[in-house]
Amino acid sequence: MKDLKVIFMGTPVFCVPILEELIKETNVLAVVTQPDKEVGRKHEISFSPIKKVAIKNNIKVLQPVKIKEEYEDIISLNPDIIITCAYGQIVPLAILNCPKYGCINVHASLLPKLRGGAPIHKAIINGYDKTGITIMYMDKGMDTGDMIEKAEVKIEDNDTAESLHDKLSAISVPLLMKTLPSIINGTNKREKQNDADATYAYNVSREEEHVSFNKSSKEIFNQIRGLNSWPGAYAVLDGKNIKLWSCVINNKKYDQAPGTIINLDKNGLEVTTTDGSVLIKELQLPGKKKMDIKDFINGNKKADYVGKCFK
């Protein structure tokens, strides 16, 4: 497939293995990625992970601020196929209609489940027991195009958004490379999505990062691990946001209101829920580093926490 002219559109680290494999196996004409960002107090310019790979391999980089208004440079390259993965903007019809083999998207869910920008987080938060990768044709909708191929992974109880991210990134490469030849020679499957089965995974809002203990232990467990390692779940104690990075479900039940801190020992910070309690195993105080429960106990007094209530 070395003569296959490809434009790749993507932004985060999830896409890096895909781009690296495409560079090895095809002729990548250009990479389209999100504009550079200023980060930190010094407002230093940060390149996307995909841009870094493109620069390393001397590949043309395009970074439209609004792709629906700035697509002529992309079309002028006359690609055979455009492959996207977590690009970050809605791709206009002018681009979708450009390549002879179409625009193909690598989406991190088993469509039509979890359409949208945060399928990895929401798969865990919403309690799914499996998810996967879907290779699909793009259309003008949000992840609504015809499906070509899928690969499935199980979501384990010890998975976090980070570990599931890595699992899905790893299986996306062989799935795409297995599927590409059939797309080129026209023998690929093409299955329409059933909109009645669709669920949505919109980007995580600030409100969704907040842990309300007025939920079941399982829901809180899923929320905390589904936001680890980015952006992180938090709860409010004494007016301060405390990051909660990991917990386990505890079978003990109490009469105290949900969110009440029952105990602090080597097993964790025990907090009541609507149907029992959870043990917080890893947390982070404002301005401090992430701590496991052992380090937290060494630097904090039990009496300062027990009896208080998370908001």
PLM regions and their residue ranges:
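One-carbon transfer enzymes
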Residues: M1-P231, G276-L279, L285, I297, ...
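C-terminal active-site/capping subdomain that shapes the small-molecule cofactor and substrate pocket
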Residues: F221-K311
